[in-house]
Every structure is written in structure tokens, then in C-alpha cells.
Amino acid sequence: MRSWVVGARLLLLLQLVLVLGAVRLPPCTDPRHCTDPPRYTPDWPSLDSRPLPAWFDEAKFGVFVHWGVFSVPAWGSEWFWWHWQGEKLPQYESFMKENYPPDFSYADFGPRFTARFFNPDSWADLFKAAGAKYVVLTTKHHEGYTNWPSPVSWNWNSKDVGPHRDLVGELGTAIRKRNIRYGLYHSLLEWFHPLYLRDKKNGFKTQYFVNAKTMPELYDLVNRYKPDLIWSDGEWECPDTYWNSTDFLAWLYNDSPVKDEVVVNDRWGQNCSCHHGGYYNCKDKFQPETLPDHKWEMCTSIDQRSWGYRRDMEMADITNESTIISELVQTVSLGGNYLLNVGPTKDGLIVPIFQERLLAVGKWLSINGEAIYASKPWRVQSEKNSVWYTSKGLAVYAILLHWPEYGILSLISPIATSTTKVTMLGIQKDLKWSLNPSGKGLLVFLPQLPPAALPTEFAWTIKLTGVK
């Protein structure tokens, strides 16, 4: 009798388990009460609630690479095709008449994009030496040519035309061998794609281009290369509803192979920039004046007049080393990341002047990286735009962009205590300091050394511990 009762109870318990297993509970949307990861819905309130993966804020410095068929004419800028045949600017029409046959089309540049000297390991070594923690490569710019064998970019991709190589895949392999995060730039629009022009003519009430080209390529890039970052662009003519951006991002955050680590920017529709996305670019070369309340990135180019390589650049167009370091310092102090662009040649070479600038950043970071990587904004960001602060743990870093008169640095913001200690990164000895006669902050007596003996040529970092 007892065994029959026990058996009956076990049977009832099994039935209960089966019933409960068949019940589909609604997804948890409040991370505070979830045991499983939340499911994001395809709308901005939900997508914007996703926490930014920590690696991006810790990285601080990345390298941007603009490379494509525009690297063949290498004149004016990477917008060459649009300036020539979209806007029909006279200087571009004259350039073509003077240098190419009358019937030469933009597609004829494709076979000349050879990447003959492209060595992904050499590029990756350079980016590593530059101190970059992530690299973003153009997979497709507004011209529509793809740097990978896109199945929906027939005869206008790097496998079919030009290099006959998977440039995105090769660089990704080399980058990741060096523990650098890999990001992919992708333009939503294509200037002259017939389906895009058809949708444009229809007032973007149809989505022939999005369904046949944009979305298939984005899903392919994610599944094929598993990027750490997607740098979207080319959004400005249409709302995010045309691009189906929220549907893609919901899949990316919920079900993609990179759902836990991937980071995205804010260019997903004409209504999104500086409002929606993982982090904000807002606009090219964006520099806020005060500390934003959202993670952001400043993207800028060593060549101030172009993102792609151009043969007509002059020395005056090249950003100097001290300006690059100053922008990096100010960006990080204000809570941002700094993404510095280079444009390789059609052959796949990064010209010496670009290499020199990148290596200068790497040299500076080898001494001062402690104040940059994984740092946080301090309670005060700057003093008189000549001293910029960062913090990490109990340490505060004051980065001075100009050497003060008589070698005495006045800092108003830090409050000294009985345990205050002051050093300069790159110099072993403690620095002497005293309370500021003004009653606020302290005076730091900088090392009396010839310029060649200082840790760096510009932007010196004072490390403060035991201050409030």
C-alpha cells in the first residue's frame, strides 16, 4: 500500500513538472529582478536601457581605417564619386578630364584597387604599437563597394574585383591575435544603388534597398566576423524606421553571436544621432565643452581634410603630434573615447607620416597610459583648459598641456591631506609640493630637467594620491 502511494505521488510530481515546463513565462524586462539576461524589444526605450559593455569605456583609444575604391583616385576626399557625379563639382570634373579617358566610369577604378602590399600583420603591429585598444575598418562606404565577399554586392566587392581577397577577414584575424578589439564600419546608404534611388523616389515609403542590401549585409557581417563594435554611418537621409534599425539591434542584443560584448554607435537613422544607440558620436570630430551624461566618442582624422587617403594632401593638412595628444587627453577627461583615422593607399600601405603620428601616440601612452586606459572622469575636468583631470581608484591624474612658468604648477581643485603624495609618470622620485598660498589646492614643484630628460615632449602627467 505504501509503495503504491509513493508511486502515485511521484507520478503527480512528474505531471506537475511537465505542466510547468510547458508554461511560457513572459520575458523579464527589469534587470533588477531577472535571473536570465533581459530580452530587448525593438524600440528605443528598451534598446537604450542596455548597459554598455565595460570594455569600450576602458579602451579609450582606437584607430579608424577608411579604405575602399575611393583610395584609387585618392584625390579630394573619400566622397570623390559623389562630388564628381552627384554634385558635379567643376574641380572633380576637370580632374577626371585631365587624368582619365572620356568614357572612364567610377566602376573602372575597382580593378585598380589592388591592395597589393596589404600586410594585415604589419598593420596590426602598427596599431598595437600605437596603443590602440580597438580598430574600426570600413567594410563598405557610401560608394557601396564591400571589403569582404558580400553575397548581395555582386561584382562590387574585394573578392570579385580588385584585390580578390577578404580584407575584412584578414585584418580581423591579425588584429585579434594581438588582443585588440575589432570594429566594423558600415554605411547604411549607397549613393547610386538603383534600389536606394528607387526608395528615395518613393519618399522612402518602400524598403527595396533595405531588404535586399542593407540588412542582409549587416546580418552577414555579424555572423561571419563577430565584431566587437558596429560603427554605423550613412543614416542621415532616412528615419530609423526605414532602415529597420531597431529590429536589427534587438536581434544583435538578444540572439546574435556577439550579444554580450558588442557595442554600437548612434547613427541608425536621421533622428538618432546623439539620442539613441550604445554610445554617441553626435557628429564627426564632436568635442563637448562639458562632461556629457552619456558615453561618447570623438572620431577624427590625421588628414584634416579627408578620411580616405588622398595624393593631394599637404603638410599643413596633417594634424601635428601635440594636437593629437591634446585631443586625446581632453576627450578622455570628458569621459569619451578617441578614434583616430588613417587612410591607406590603394596598394594597402599606410604612408610614413600617418605611421609617425600613430607611433607618437603609442610612445606617449607607454608613459602616460596609466592616466588614460580604464580611467574615469574626476569631479573636476579641467583648469583653464591647460590642465585636464582623470581618475582611477584612489589616484587623481592632472595632465598639463603646457609647462608652467618657473616650473611651478598651481592646481586649484585638489584638496591636500596628511597623506598626499605627488609624482610625475615616467619619473621615479616624488615631487615636492606645498599648499597653495591662495588657500585653494596646492603648488607642485616640477622636476628641474632639460627637455630631453623629461618623460615626454608634451603633455606631462602628475599623479596625486591622498587628495580629495
Curated annotation (Swiss-Prot):
Give GO terms: molecular function aspect only: alpha-L-fucosidase activity
Give the UniProt record's GO annotations in the biological process aspect.
fucose metabolic process; glycolipid catabolic process; glycoside catabolic process
Keyword Glycoprotein in the entry? The reply is yes
Q: Which reaction does it catalyse?
A: an alpha-L-fucoside + H2O = L-fucose + an alcohol; a neolactoside IV(2)-alpha-Fuc-nLc4Cer(d18:1(4E)) + H2O = a neolactoside nLc4Cer(d18:1(4E)) + L-fucose; a neolactoside IV(2)-alpha-Fuc-nLc4Cer(d18:0) + H2O = a neolactoside nLc4Cer(d18:0) + L-fucose
* Phosphothreonine found at: T173
Q: Could you say which EC number(s) this protein's record lists?
A: 3.2.1.51
- InterPro entries associated with the record: FUC_metazoa-typ, Fucosidase_C, Glyco_hydro_29, Glyco_hydro_29_CS, Glyco_hydro_b, Glycoside_hydrolase_SF
Q: Which residues form the signal peptide?
A: 1-22
Keyword Oxidoreductase carried by entry: no
Record's subcellular location: Lysosome
Q: Where is this site: May be important for catalysis?
A: C299
Q: Which GO terms describe its cellular component?
A: lysosome; membrane
Give the matching SMART domains: Alpha_L_fucos
Q: Which residues are glycosylated?
A: N244, N271, N320
Superkingdom of this entry's organism? Eukaryota
Q: Which one Pfam family would you cite for this protein? A: Alpha_L_fucos
Give the record's keywords alphabetically: Glycoprotein, Glycosidase, Hydrolase, Lipid metabolism, Lysosome, Phosphoprotein, Signal
Q: How does it assemble?
A: Homotetramer.
Tell me, what does this protein do in biology?
Alpha-L-fucosidase is responsible for hydrolyzing the alpha-1,6-linked fucose joined to the reducing-end N-acetylglucosamine of the carbohydrate moieties of glycoproteins.
Q: Which family does it belong to?
A: Belongs to the glycosyl hydrolase 29 family.
Protein name, as recorded? Tissue alpha-L-fucosidase
Species name:
Bos taurus
